[in-house]
From Swiss-Prot:
Matches recorded under NCBIfam families: Gln_ase, PRK00971.1-1, PRK00971.1-2
Protein name per UniProt: Glutaminase
Family note: Belongs to the glutaminase family.
EC number(s) recorded for this UniProt protein: 3.5.1.2
Catalytic reaction equation(s): L-glutamine + H2O = L-glutamate + NH4(+)
């Protein structure tokens, strides 16, 4: 596996320069674009990594999975009364579909859906940002994980579209908390700073029937883990989920920080990072690396 990861990074490195960093979030626009890392965490506890796998980056929308898992833990099936688990086929920050469907987001991985999940969690936790941070620390076994306040503040200063989604949902009585408070928590979640190894470990429970080896806790039931994986497979890469399924064939979740996490059920969790994005907001080189890895070891679930 180690030789394979090194080989794959060498093969995809020439693609660097073809994408663009997420400069609409000023703090992310400062990230050096030519970085590339990958990590694989097996269910047997082995970790393999290559490239810039130990360089921390902003996880952004990857955090939506952690938020969803927290909500499932404390509210179970009730959460689906306020949002769906269908693909949207729209950009992740679209307001058109949200208006048309009366403030009920299609799934928890578009921005509106993630805001509903944060609204649900906000009512359950006294300190939502700290609760999220501590949860992620347990999942990856790294007590040093923190949220980058510079990134969170940068996103909050450019919150208009997310605020619009929240207020639109509030007009349909599908958003109950204080919009500004929920937005601050949401951006702190997105601004969590982790590296590929951290994220591969943190997502290990989804490859292991909901069991986290680091903390020894059953994070989700096996059935719930399967359900989360299914939503990742259909909605985890914005409006490019179909292309990811075609090319990689695994449940995945991306973020505009350039990270992509993929789950190989019963076998491993993988994280790749390259900050240059394609037109859909997903890591251009990261997707190419995952496509090669999945093909070489026959990991597609299809």
């Amino acid at each position: 596996m180690q030789d394979l990861l090194n080989e794959i990074l060498d093969e995809v490195r020439p693609l660097l320069g073809q994408g663009k960093v997420a400069d609409y979030i000023p703090a992310l626009g400062e990230v050096r674009p030519d970085q590339l890392g990958i990590a694989v965490y097996g269910n047997d506890g082995q970790v393999f990594s290559a490239g810039d796998a130990e360089t921390a980056f902003s996880i952004q929308s990857i955090s939506k999975v952690f938020s969803l898992v927290q909500a499932i833990n404390h509210s179970g099936e009730e959460i689906w009364q306020r949002l769906g688990h269908e693909p949207s086929g729209q950009p992740f920050n679209s307001l058109v579909q949200l208006e048309f469907e009366q403030g009920r987001p299609r799934n928890p991985f578009i921005n509106a859906g993630a805001l509903v999940i944060c609204d649900i969690n906000q009512a359950r936790f006294a300190a939502p940002s700290l609760s999220m941070r501590d949860f992620v620390r347990r999942l990856c076994g790294n007590r040093a994980i923190t949220s980058d306040s510079k990134v969170a503040d940068s996103e909050y200063q450019h919150r208009s579209r997310n605020a619009a989604a929240a207020y639109l949902m509030k007009s349909f009585d599908n958003f109950h908390g204080d919009v500004e408070d929920v937005l601050r928590s949401y951006f702190h979640h997105c601004a969590l700073s982790m590296n590929c190894i951290d994220l591969a470990k943190a997502f290990g429970f989804l490859a292991h029937q909901g069991f986290c080896a680091h903390s020894g806790e059953q994070v989700l039931t096996a059935r719930q883990a399967t359900q989360v994986n299914s939503i990742m497979a259909t909605s985890g890469l914005y409006d490019e989920a179909g292309n990811f399924a075609y090319r990689v064939g695994l449940p995945g979740k991306s973020g505009v920080g350039g990270g992509i996490v993929a789950i190989v059920p019963e076998r491993a969790s993988v994280c790749v990072w390259s900050p240059e994005l394609n037109a859909a907001g997903n890591s251009l080189v990261g997707m190419a690396a995952l496509e090669k890895l999945s093909a070489r070891v026959d990991w597609s679930v299809f």
